[in-house]
Amino acid sequence: MSIKRRSVLKGMLATGASIATLKAPAVHAQAAPFKLGLLTVKTGPLAQGGIQMEQGVLTFLKETNNTMAGRKVEFFSADTGGSPAGTKTKVQELVERDKVDVILGPLAAFELLAITDYIAQVKTPLLSLAAAEDMTQRRPNPYFLRASATSAQAMHPMAEYAAKELKLKRIVTISEDFAFGHEQMGGFQRVFEDNGGKILKKLWPPLVTPDYTP
């Protein structure tokens, strides 16, 4: 796991510790365990990133002697399989069966978008690295906290550079056909067109396409 991702995960968990303090009545602060759920991906094409997420959380808990805000932590990890349907099932299990106080994850934007209405309904705080723009812009969720950038943010300076420095006027874009890829290209298009450019065509190869030849 990179130092950057490890630092971000530690920041998320530190925020979780603050929530642990706020959610528990003072009388039970020492006695009641803090239930921490993780929605991650351990199977399928996104598994590498999901496994790193779990390793980061486990490392943090080991370093803190399995405590957060003075409370013992009960940790629950759920494999979403990297699908919206799997994410919906697993988040319901964490909330309704395991009774978690806070959820970390999921990894992918399309997973996050699949569960945002449910999270708002059950009012369980969700801390995520997923970059779905809608969660903080078009469909803000008061129970969601992002610990990373949005999908489109990194594309804004790239589009400005292409238009202003490279003087490009017409571009064909290519990105994976899933939520993150669409939001990335949407961010690029907005800034590029604001600077006088034009997108001629958008290409959407399926996720994890091995061959990009015509």
Residue map of PLM features:
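N-terminal export signals
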Residues: 7-28
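Short beta->alpha junction loops
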Residues: 76-84, 202-210
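Extracytoplasmic ligand/sensor domains, especially the bilobed periplasmic-binding protein
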Residues: 100-207
